[in-house]
Amino acid sequence: MPTDTVFNLLDEPWITVLDSSGSQQRVSILDAFERAPWLGMIDGEVPTQGFAIKRLLLAFLHRAIDGPRDQDEWEQLWKADELPLERIHDYARQVRPRFDLFDTEAPFFQVASLHTAKNEISGLEKIVADVPNGEPYFTSRSAASLRRIDAAEAARWLVHAHAFDPSGIKSGAVGDPKVKGGRGYPIGTGWAGQLGGVLPQGANLRETLLLNLVSRDVETFVRIGGKDDVPPWEREPDGPEHQDDRPPRGAIDLYTWQTRRVRLAGDRDGVTGVLLANGDKIQPQNRQSLDPHTAWRYSDPQSKKFKKTVYMPQTHDPNRSVWRGIAAMLPSISGRRIGSGDSQRYLAPGVLQWLGDLTSEGKLSETYVPRVRVLGAEYGSQSATYNEIIDDVLPLSVVLLRQDSPAAGQTAKEAVADAENVGKAIWGFAENIAQAAGAEPKSGAGDRAREQLYAALESPYRAWLAELGPSTDLAGARAEWQRIVDSATTPITDELIEEAAPAAWNGRTIQNHLVNVAIAEVWFKAALRRALPMTRTSSENTALEKAV
């Protein structure tokens, strides 16, 4: 039990979760496991905090059960009413001393002796990620709240810092031979910050943890649970020095990678400052067999540089809707089982390949639809500041994830292609009207119209995707989607026509062709019929469309 000085994360409520009613609660690590069937999503001050804490819990659970060894053991866990609490508590007793946030010798995720030559302590804005660029004037958080935070919040930001801290100059720790002039020079962001996070969620926290609890026997796409693949609380405490060349030993190692050396200034009554120094540097090239929570992309420049095939994490673009990049996420399209020596554009996240395999083997029902959480951080110049945090959710029926039965995934991919082909058509329509009125090419009118279309399709695509199941008529579903896309164009094109300048109706000659609103509309309708062939019969083409 807690004492006046100890703040042990196994017992103290520090993790923010949503209960079944959607209300926020705080739970300890052991509470989270014990109450997992009745708890929902792990929350936090920022979405990426929940991602980092879930991976911490996964590392703990993997080590507590020393597995799962294979799909059969996983299936037993899935069918049980609760997590294996006896084994969890046995493991907790073994590692308990290492979870004290303010231990004098081995504080959790920190270095007890960490100090600078001048014994400086920085403000909390160094780790509090909802203060943009370290500027308290541009946040709803009050200045007073940055002078002191409670120990529970400090623990959340500590875990987040190791996972997502920006690059840039850090405090120079005494004892780190790489410090120059009292400064620690940039080694890159936290490991999770280099990923395009993909984490499937179930109906409750228990399901979420188990969906992500990849078994040891799938080394073809996730290496986890080997002899040396252990979290920092099972290793000797870190010192101030950091390592630039230690290879990660497996997924558990990466879930808890110590990208920084940290010391919190405070106690269980509150934390007032932090010392943040460089930790273990890690490069992203070819970690696809180690970290299951991101898609991977083939990099031609990196492959040429290293003279071998190189895959890099597929990070999320905040300016592009997640659903439009679904092909990279689906094992049915970008599966890991490819021929020896072959390379492909994308490799799907290992955790989704795992769920697809569980479905293929009958361990997971084909009707199951996890909500796949998509998270990541976009950084600013030289990755030294946060620019934006990406947070989205896609419902993905497990039938979309089967590499051995790719038809449903292919339909989902083709539906995106339908939308993008119509996006090109509506871009051309808007550009033609703008140029007919006298605008220069690529004036921006096309970009705006295309983005309007994608925004209009955002919710319909998610709803359509969620309906793809094992008994779905895929051809019928594709035709229905094409009708949805067709309907979505109408308000956009009507607005473009209504707001067209008078000069656009008269038009002008561009590259020896008269372009005006009427002709642009005919061209668009012809392009629309080519892009959405399942919405009309070929006999519907008009004589004018054939003429142009």
Locate predicted features.
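Short functional micro-motifs and their immediate structural scaffolds
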Residues: 155-158
